[in-house]
Amino acid sequence: MNKVYLVAVLVLFLALTINESNEAVPTGGCPFSDFFCAKRCKDMKFGNTGRCTGPNKTVCKCSI
């Protein structure tokens, strides 16, 4: 029973990891949150502020 439980937990963990990694890929350059997007905009001198937009918040939009 313990082996079955361990295999089930590993499969669930693997499925969640694969699902999460597909959504977390920053396709337009938006890292994790609006704060990091704004920091990236300032560091790269694209603008003063930035926020994540798009259907899954994967695009970082910078503005002056």
UniProtKB/Swiss-Prot annotation:
Disulfide bonds join C30-C52, C37-C60, C41-C62. GO terms for cellular component: extracellular region. This recombinant toxin inhibits mammalian voltage-gated potassium channels Kv1.3/KCNA3 (IC(50)=0.79 nM) and Kv1.2/KCNA2 (IC(50)=26.4 nM). Keywords: Disulfide bond, Ion channel impairing toxin, Neurotoxin, Potassium channel impairing toxin, Secreted, Signal, Toxin, Voltage-gated potassium channel impairing toxin. This is Potassium channel toxin alpha-KTx J123. Has the structural arrangement of an alpha-helix connected to antiparallel beta-sheets by disulfide bonds (CS-alpha/beta). It comes from the Eukaryota. It is found in: Secreted. One of its GO terms (molecular function) is toxin activity. Belongs to the short scorpion toxin superfamily. Potassium channel inhibitor family. Alpha-KTx 11 subfamily. The keyword Signal applies. Residues 1-21 form the signal peptide. Expressed by the venom gland. Its main location: secreted.
